[in-house]
Structures are given as structure tokens and as C-alpha cells.
Amino acid sequence: MKNKIFHAFVLCFFIIVTTVAQQKKITVFAAGTEGHKSYRIPAIISLPGGKLFAFCEGRVNGSGDFGDINIVMKTSDDKGKTWSALRTIVDAGRLQAGNPAPVVDLTDPLYPSGRIFLFYNTGNNAEGEVRKGNGLREVWYKTSADGGLTWSKATNITLQVHRPRQPRVNAAYNFAEDWRSYANTPGHAMQFNSGNYKGRIFVAANHSAGEPRQHFTDYTANGFYTDDHGKTFTLSENVPVPGGNENMAVALSGSRLMLNFRNQRGDIKSRIVAISSNGGASWDTAYFDKNLPDPICQGSILQVGNNKGQNILAFCNAADTARRNLLTLRISFNDGRTWKKNIWLTKLLTGIKVIIPLIRTS
């Protein structure tokens, strides 16, 4: 579920290079410029050579979550200091294209330099109406094998990774599960780079099912993955915690996977965590991490290194339980069990945020 608040008039990525003193705020997409009145839902990845790709929703007519919305991209060759002109990668006409979830596949022998996958959603009505059954969300991807210069035609994977009941739109969309609202992960998808599931691309997601329920308990977190470089996809089990929303995935040591997501119910103001020992197919445990306070807002999590056989994780969110304030970066040296280093970035009102692997943990 996307934020209704559009904070300020620019969208910024926080790039943490070494220490807090070196923190620098870079304006990548400025509202009211380059053909769009608003920019929301950022996502960012890097290629092995260091080139950065920033994606987001370019909202043509305003900051609302539904309408004429494109997926746009900029690139940087100098670690985010300067950025290219804007390019439109997905244009769904007057309808919505959103929830960009990019990832670089570095394990396909056909593409030794890597191939970028851009997963995204389309929608033909506002989220509240889709949640009532009056609309459809679909799931797609595009790829680029030349560093973002050109992009493939879109591939529709809705039948593999979604369970809509909209037979009037498509006779095949007649699933008993009756999933309605659907959103890919914010920030980025992920790929296992080692272990039992090396090469698996996992896209965290969330969906609503059936008629709307109080406190958004019709929502739940899930994900989907491919082990054959996008030829086929498999759905994960749902995380058995009602209200899961804006879900991100990160690799842990021992071929495990963590999901980290917001609690849309709002009764407990902390992040929800789910752990999988089989690469995200099912979930061993799910719990509220009281060390990660959250005001019901999107957060971002990323693996940034390894420490004595355990993955080093970086997590960034608004750490004020009352309002979307206190943007904080936290570092865990033990697969997210504890968070030892907490860096306060800004007290200002904040919404969507992402982190990228320019972090040095020494």
C-alpha cells in the first residue's frame, strides 16, 4: 500500500558512503520537471562496475497513487554524484504502471555481463476499488542485456505469480483465492549469489484477498521466484501474519531468506520479519522485531557484507512510531538478530526510502 502523503517536492536517495559525516543528499527526481508532476516509489540497483540505475513512478498529473503513471529511469556513472536525463521505460497509456522492482541477474551464462530484470505492476483502477473487486492488478517484467540502453518487450507473468478472480477480463483469471490488490516489493528484488539457491531471483510482494476487512487484515505478505532466469516462476507460501504490506527480501547466511515488512494493521508499531530456510518457498517463523520501530511506512533492507560467516545487513526506515520522522540507518552484523550500529540521518518527515550498496561497514 502506497503512502498518501507526498512529502516535500523532491525525491531523494540517501547514499551512505563511509561515515555519517560524509552523508550527502542527492536530488534524483524533482517533482514538476521532465514531464511529471510527482515522483514516487523509488528503486535503485547497481551493476558490478558501479553504474547506478534509479527507477520510480513518474506521476504525470499529480501525486495520487492511481492515474497516468509511468515507470521512469535515470542512471549514474559516478556513484550518484550526477544523473542522466530521464527515460520512460514503461508507459501504460493513461493507466497505472508502478511498483518497480529491479534486480541484476549475474548468474545466467548467456549474459556474462549481467541482465537487468525490471518487475512491475499495472492497474486499471485505484487500490481501494481493486480491493473491492472493481479492478485488476497484473504483474510483468522487462529485461535489458546492454546496461539499460535497450529493453525487451514486456512479459506478463500474472498467471504464475498472482491469483486474481476476474474472468470477465481474462477467462484464465478465475482463481478461487480471489487475490485483489497486488504490489511488488519496493526498492529492489534480490538474487542469491551463493549457497543452495545460487541464482534464484526472489521478488517479495503483498496482496489482499477477498472482501476488504477491518484494519487491513485482508492483506498478507508473500513472494515469487525463478530458478531459470525468468522462464518460469513459482509462488511462495503466504506469511501467516494478517496485515503484511510493502515487503522486502534479503539473503541471510546458510541459504536462508528474510522478509521485512510493515504492519498495515497498525496495532504493533514495529517491523514484521519472516525467515525461510528453503529460499523463500515457505516460512519457518514470523515475528515482530521490537528493535525496529515503525510508524506504518515503507522501509529498506540490503545485504552489504559478511562477518564471520553471518551476513551484514543495512536497514533504513522512519523510526518514529507516531509519525514518519527520524530516518535511521541500522547495521546488523549477525543476520539481523541484533542491530548494533544506529545512524540517525534526518528528523524531517520522510516517506519512501531506499538504500544501495555503496555502504562500507568498516
What role is predicted for each listed range?
Residues 1-23:
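Bacterial Sec-dependent N-terminal signal peptides
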